[in-house]
């Protein structure tokens, strides 16, 4: 059984036991969360409604990216760095 969930503006195909990296979620490491389900599928490919639960197993920040802006002939240069936060979630159950 697998499901399609949506979080952080993106959709993920998940099955029980998967560990996925999603945009930062509120919650402490080890806490249980319920993820919004777009669709759930049984083994035969039948579409059913369902519920997905997961556990937060980690949180970190991605590698820094550099954003560089400039305007030619105007002596304007600007450098900015950005690190995106993410959360690792272990999928527990896909319930129908």
Swiss-Prot record:
InterPro entries: bL21-like (IPR028909), bL21-like_sf (IPR036164), Ribosomal_bL21 (IPR001787), Ribosomal_bL21_CS (IPR018258)
Single biological process term from Gene Ontology: translation
Gene Ontology CC terms: cytoplasm; ribonucleoprotein complex; ribosome
UniProt similarity note: Belongs to the bacterial ribosomal protein bL21 family.
Oligomeric and partner information: Part of the 50S ribosomal subunit. Contacts protein L20.
Biological function: This protein binds to 23S rRNA in the presence of protein L20.
NCBIfam families registered for this protein in UniProt: L21
Protein name: Large ribosomal subunit protein bL21
Gene designation: rplU
């Amino acid at each position: 059984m697998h499901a399609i969930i949506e979080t952080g503006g993106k959709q993920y195909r998940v099955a029980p036991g998967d560990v996925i990296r999603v945009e930062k979620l509120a919650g402490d490491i080890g806490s249980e969360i319920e993820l919004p389900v777009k669709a759930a599928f049984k083994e035969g490919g039948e579409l059913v409604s369902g519920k997905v639960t997961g556990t937060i197993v980690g949180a970190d920040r991605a590698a820094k990216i550099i954003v560089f802006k400039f305007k030619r002939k105007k002596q304007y240069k600007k450098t900015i760095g950005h690190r995106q936060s993410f959360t690792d979630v272990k999928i527990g159950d896909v319930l129908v």
